[in-house]
Amino acid sequence: MISERRTNYSEKQNRAGCDLVFTVPKSCSIEASRNEEFRVVLERCHKGAVENTLNYIEQNYIQYEQKKEGMKSIVKTDNMICAKIEHTLNRNQEPLIHTHAIIINKTRDAEGQYRAIHHGQIFKNQIFLSQLYKNQLAKELELNSCKIQVVDKARGNFELIGYSREHIEAFSTRHQQIEKETERLIKEYSSRGIELPLAEIKDRATRLTREAKQKADMPKLQEAWAITRAECGIDTIPKQHPKALKETLNPIDKKDHLDRALLEISNKTTAFRKEEYSALALREGLGKGITQDDIEKYFANKLASNTLFETWAKGSIHYASKESLALENSIYKIGRASCRERV
């Protein structure tokens, strides 16, 4: 989701900006290539989901590093400069509606002076931010009567109902190029005893297979896409017919999903960051209308009712449920009693 734009200046100032890429599910781009009514609604929903995510980043993750009397500290602001560039094709000239949101490396401090942005929170919370976008997009599409299905719950991915993996692969040669190059690089690095994170290898594969952009001849592309759709059977899939609907998931249903997510993460760890819970809850609530606004209200209610508590761990604010803290306390007491018996 995130890459970096660099310049040739000094190390401290060399990051020109942070490039966030928001991409609609492939089936949505394919459907938009044959369905003008759906395309108009999809682009509106996509832009809304992108804006929602960028607003969250601006209000929560824009910071700068400050040094006073030899001590460094991170100071939060609430402003950023962001340029959005919208595309409808990938480099292989296949349908792919996506937006590059480039956050310029400048934010104003309380005195109105520009400061270089400290990107730590943005990079740290990539998974959460990606899911934040996907859930908002899914909700907006469903509120326009579009039919979606969760295809990968673990990764929080959805597609339009009716589209199979084969349909999507028919328009995903760029993705296949990157995957093939990634496999080659993994084997090469392994033979040389080099260990790199998978994300870094994929980024290198993307760059190595990136061809120069070509000027799009849309009439010819539409003809080629129509042939591909017919050959792989996409034309037999009923078209989406958007129509505004009222939200159908009631607050009680949402609370049940959020409670289950809290129980699941509490069973894995005593204390967790809000973003860790949010990413899980959003994945669990994908296609059910759950967004970050619901999670924020849920957290506020839990804190107010003393069933969720703030704690400090690993240098940042974490949260723990009442039950987890009680269990940890009982284990601690048992351990203390056992030590006394041995003494």
How should each PLM-predicted stretch be described?
Residues 1-343:
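Helicase P-loop NTPase motor core of nucleic-acid translocases
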